[in-house]
């Protein structure tokens, strides 16, 4: 019989093996060292490329952060931003949930005390090709981009990433994201779910447990209806404009944009939103260089598209930082000499390359995942005008799920953080006073909510 000392040694060796087994030669080549401006931390992080198509030379860029403590026992979470065309490195990692936030000059980094890798191992992926550092050597690939293309490439990425980091293959796996990732996340989850049913190739199995969606684009008709209703309800547009839209627009129809009154009414909302930050109605806009202030023409050309976006000042700081030679070299994005022109959102994906497919609704996928027993949580910052809380509530109501627990406030540090409701198979919560990118506005509350999600328990429902 083993004594206490031997048991301790055995446990230590098991833990050590868990770390060592994650360090494949490829993984060690991706280990980030001497990252410019990085605060001193005890966890490791890795960055680099995973080739998803050898023939076309298509590769996706990732940045992976071990959990701050006990990475060998904590789950793995993939974070995706939307767009289509926006970077999970520039937004999720840099402005929201990553451990290193870019300062207000783009010169250095500051530690994020509310980083989500306090609770999990976090993997950021720039997808599809053409986003951030991700690329293809075959230019025709860029004209094939769409939801299905992105889901397939993301799945291939995961399979190859797990070969590089085998210690994470069997961990509980979750997918999280916001805005247009409201499409990406369930679509990728569906691919994983379907592929996992292939009992003849168990080596491809991914231990998917659930999805987490923030201010997500979900269903075309409900998203647009909620967008219009929210703008009127928050006094952004006149009663007359609202009346015209309600009378002339049928967002369930493919031809609604051919109706002159409908298009002009929607244009009027966009015109008014030009004056403020649509993604956060009650915060100031950045005046020195605001892509939002100058984006009215882009909105008009991308109707009926809905796309991601955040505080343009933060976007600018990220652009400065990730175009530095020393930063690109440290992240293994380039050799530090032949630099890439990194942008936080690639407008070409919508404006020039087109987007070949976008599901009108992912609610059928919600139903499929719920029936499969996966955890589905949705949250919404209630001051976001782009993918507003009304849109999300309309979408959830469309599912007609039985209510499990009554609508009630949830709390963080004795204050009301938002409201919360559990349905059979789905959990919905709001964040009071948060805009589109909720963790940027409510970092402490978001971390607490994320922890509750991982544990499958409600956030605090009393002070």
Swiss-Prot record:
GO terms for biological process: proteolysis. GO terms for molecular function: serine-type carboxypeptidase activity. GO terms for cellular component: extracellular region. Disulfide bonds join 86-345, 249-262, 286-313. Residues 1-22 form the signal peptide. The active site is at residues 179, 384, 436. Its EC number is 3.4.16.-. It comes from the Eukaryota. Belongs to the peptidase S10 family. Probable carboxypeptidase. The keyword Coiled coil does not apply. InterPro entries: AB_hydrolase_fold (IPR029058), Peptidase_S10 (IPR001563), Ser_caboxypep_ser_AS (IPR018202). Keywords: Carboxypeptidase, Disulfide bond, Glycoprotein, Hydrolase, Protease, Secreted, Signal. Glycans are attached at residues 137, 201, 250, 341, 354. Gene3D superfamilies: 3.40.50.11320, 6.10.250.940, alpha/beta hydrolase. It holds the Pfam family Peptidase_S10. Expressed in flowers. Its main location: secreted. It comes from Arabidopsis thaliana. It is found in: Secreted. This is Serine carboxypeptidase-like 32. It is an enzyme of class 3 (hydrolase).
């Amino acid at each position: 019989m083993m004594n206490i000392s031997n048991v301790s040694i055995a446990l230590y060796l098991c833990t050590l093996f868990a770390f060592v087994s994650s360090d494949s030669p490829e993984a060690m080549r991706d280990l980030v060292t001497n990252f410019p401006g990085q605060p001193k931390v005890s966890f490791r992080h890795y960055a680099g490329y995973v080739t998803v198509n050898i023939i076309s030379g298509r590769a996706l860029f990732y940045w992976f952060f071990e959990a701050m403590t006990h990475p060998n026992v904590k789950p793995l979470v993939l974070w995706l931003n939307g767009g289509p065309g926006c970077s999970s490195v520039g937004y999720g990692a840099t402005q929201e949930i990553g451990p290193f936030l870019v300062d207000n000059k783009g010169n250095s980094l500051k530690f994020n005390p509310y980083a989500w890798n306090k609770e999990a191992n976090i993997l950021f992926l720039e997808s599809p090709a053409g986003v951030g550092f991700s690329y293809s050597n075959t230019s025709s690939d860029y004209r094939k981009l769409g939801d299905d293309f992105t889901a397939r490439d993301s799945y291939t990425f995961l399979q190859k990433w797990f070969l590089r980091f085998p210690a994470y293959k069997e961990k509980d796996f979750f997918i999280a994201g916001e805005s247009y990732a409201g499409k990406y996340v369930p679509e990728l989850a569906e691919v994983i779910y379907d592929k996992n049913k292939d009992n003849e190739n168990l080596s491809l199995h991914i231990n998917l447990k659930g999805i987490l969606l923030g201010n997500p684009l979900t269903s075309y008709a409900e998203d647009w209806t909620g967008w219009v209703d929210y703008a009127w309800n928050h006094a952004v547009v006149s009663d007359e404009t609202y009346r015209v839209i309600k009378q002339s627009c049928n967002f369930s129809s493919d031809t609604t944009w051919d109706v002159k009154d409908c298009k002009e009414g929607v244009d009027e909302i966009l015109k008014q939103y030009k004056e403020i930050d649509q993604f956060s109605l009650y915060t100031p806009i950045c005046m020195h260089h605001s892509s939002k202030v100058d984006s009215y023409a882009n909105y008009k050309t991308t109707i009926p598209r809905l796309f991601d976006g955040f505080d343009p000042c933060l976007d600018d700081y990220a652009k400065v930082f990730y175009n530095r030679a020393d930063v690109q070299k440290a992240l293994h994005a380039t050799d530090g000499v032949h630099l890439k022109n990194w942008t936080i959102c690639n407008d070409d994906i919508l404006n020039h390359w087109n987007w070949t497919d976008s599901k009108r609704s992912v609610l059928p996928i919600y139903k499929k995942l719920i029936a499969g027993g996966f955890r589905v949580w949705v949250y919404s910052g209630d001051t976001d005008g782009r993918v507003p809380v009304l849109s999300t509530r309309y979408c959830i109501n469309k599912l007609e799920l039985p209510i499990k627990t009554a609508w009630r406030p949830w709390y963080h540090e004795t204050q009301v953080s938002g409201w919360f409701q559990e349905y059979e198979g789905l959990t919905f919560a709001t964040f009071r006073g948060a805009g589109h990118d909720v963790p940027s506005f409510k970092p402490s509350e978001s971390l607490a909510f994320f922890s509750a999600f991982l544990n499958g328990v409600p956030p605090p429902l009393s002070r």
